[in-house]
Amino acid sequence: MGPVVLFDKSFLQSLSVDESVWFDHFFLPVVSPLFFVETLADLTKQQRPGSLRTPEDEVRVIADKTPVLSGAPCVHHSQLCIANLLGHHAPHVGQIPVAGGRPVRGAEGKPGVVFENSPEAEAFARWQRGRFHEVERDLASNWRAMLSELNLPEIAQRIRALGITPQTCKSVEEAYGIAAALVHSRYEPQQQLGLLFAFVQMPAYLRASIVHRWSEAGFPPLAHYASYAAHVLQVELFFQIALAANLISADRPSNRVDIAYLFYLPFCHIFVSGDKLHRRCAPVFLTKQQDFVWAAELKDDLARINRELMATSEVERQQGLHTLAPRPPGDSSTLLVSLWEKHAFGSPSEDGAEPPFSHEAQRKLVEHVNSFAKAP
C-alpha cells in the first residue's frame, strides 16, 4: 500500500491523464476540501481569449485526473477541529479522516465499517460527464467565505492580547516558532480559544461546552489537550503573523486559500505542490517522518514510469495495474522508489515483488467485502 499524499490543484493540473492514473495507483491521495473549492471556483472564471475550452471544460479535465481508486475526500478541517475539542481523538499520519462510516457486521459476524460514496466523490464523477449542480457551487462559496470573511479587528485585538508582535518576526521559521510556543503553553487559554472560534466560525451553541470541558481539564496546553485543534490554530496564527511581518504578501487573495492546505498536513506522509507559498511554508510544519515534494519533480518521475510501463507488451498491460506494477519501477535513486521505501505501508518481499494473489484468494476477498456492503 502506497504512502498517503496530500496534493494541491496546481500539481494535478500539471499531470497528463496517464500520469494521474499512476499517481492514483502508487499513492493514497488525500482529496482535501480546498481542492474541491479551487476546482469549482474555476467555473466562475471567464473563458480565456483564443481558447476553445469553456470553464466547464476546464473543470471536467481536472475531474478526469482526480484520484478515485485509492484517494478519499477528507473531512473539512472545521468539523475535525470541533470534534477534537469535544473529546474525539484526532487522526494521525497515514490516516485519512473520511465522513459517513456505517458500522456493520459481515456474514460471519465480524465487525466492519461501510463508507458510501461521499458527496464530493459523486460530484467529481458527475463533473467528468459535464454535469454541475448549483448546490455544489453554493457549498464551495460557503467554504471559501469561511476562509476569506474573517473579523480582522477582533483577530488583531486577540493577537495583541496574547503579547504577539508580528513586526519583530524576520522569517517564516520565527513565525512558526511563535505560533508553536503559544499552543504549547498555558498562556491566556480564553484568548486562544477566542481566536480559534473566530478562525473556524465555531457555532455559538457549542462554545460554552467547549470552554467548560477544557476548564474542567485544568486548561492544559492546547497542543496536549486537542492536538488537531492546536494545529489549526497554529497554522492560522502563523499566517497572520507572517502577513503582518510582510513575509507573505497581503496583495494576493489566493494566499489565504493556499495556506489552508496546511490544515491537512497531519494526515499525510507527503505533501506535493507546485505552489511557491507551499514550498516556503509547508516544510516548517512537517515532521521528520514527512516530506514536501515539488510538483515538477514528481511529475517527471511519473512520466518516466509511464514511458517504461507503456513500453511493455500488450499482454502484460492487459493484466491490470496491480499485476503490471505492484510497486514503482526503478531503484532508490528515483523519486517514487525512494518515497515508497521511506513511507509505504508494509515491507517488500526479498526479491522486491508482491507475494502472488491467487484467483481463489481474490474471490474470497470479494465475497468478504460484499458481505459488509450488503449488511443492514
Which role does the model predict for each range below?
Residues G274:
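Conserved residues at the C-terminal ends of beta-strands
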Residues G2-F267, L277-P376:
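Active-site-proximal, substrate-binding regions of enzyme catalytic domains
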